Structures are given as structure tokens and as C-alpha cells.
Amino acid sequence: MDLQTSIKSYKNNVASKYEFLDASNLEQIGNQKYFCSKKIDGQTFFLSVQNDNIQILNSSSQDFSINLQHIVEQVKNLKIKENIILVGELFDNSKKRERNGDVIVALTSKSSNLAIALFDIVKQENISNSFLEKYEKLKKLFGDDNTKPIFALSQ
């Protein structure tokens, strides 16, 4: 799995199509099935697990694993056996309201208050076809307990 290519492809083909929805434009979805989650105001980060190598990168593919060892250790404890790249929002879990600027400050201080709320699978060995299958896999791997440093964002 080429990590940089996967991140770039996700940003160009998936993230660029994210849409903000509120009550005023919800009708545009119509009767289509859709998934939505709380918007966390942090920074988009990618989690890569490849052959027991765990990396946490920002959307520019800069590796912040050394600053986020508390998350890396939690992922190691999960003993994930497949190569997989996930995406989520990195945020300061100690604040009542998430703010992008808090992430920048916390990264420089290697704060253990940072958490990552995973919301999608970028690439995996065992392919899940639908988003629902991907979400179920996220929940199975990481749970949805938002008090932990890493969790699947509830839909």
C-alpha cells in the first residue's frame, strides 16, 4: 500500500466531495440513503497500519507519530492483523468545544489530550463494499467510546 498515493487519492476523490448539511439544505438529499456524523473542528489525519508499523500522518503526509505515541500505543494494543489506512479528525478531547488551533498547540507539546475520531477507511486488504460495512468494521476495530484516544465516530 503506497501511503502517500492513497492519501492524495482520498483527498482528491473523496474528501473534495464532502458536503456540509444543515436543516436548510437537507432536502437536496431526497429519499437517498445517507450517513452523517457530528462535525468535529480539528484536523484531518490518517492512521496507517502496515506490517506492525503504525503511522499517524496529516493530510500533507507529514508523520506525527512521535507526537502521538499515546494513540500509537493504543493501536498497537489492538493487534490489527491487516494492512489498512484510515482517516479521521484529530482534536483536543479535553475541551468542551473542539477548535483547530488547539490541535496545533497540543501537537507541539505532545499532549495526551489529543484523540482521533475515525470516520472512513481509505484503503484496506479485505475490501468492504459499502460505507455501512466500512463503518461496522471501524466500530469493531476501535469501538465508539469517545473518551478514548482513538474511536470510530458515531453516525
State where each predicted segment sits:
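Charged, flexible boundary elements
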Residues: D2-C36
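Compositionally biased, low-structure terminal segments
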Residues: K11, E19-L21, S65, D92, ...
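N-terminal cationic leader/targeting segments used for protein routing and processing
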Residues: N12-V14, G101, P149
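A sequence-composition feature that detects small, non-aromatic residues
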Residues: A15, A23, A106, A115-A117, ...
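Covalent nucleotidyltransferase
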Residues: E27-T147
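Acidic carboxylate-rich catalytic motifs and surrounding loops in phosphoryl-/glycosyl-chemistry enzymes
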Residues: K148-Q155
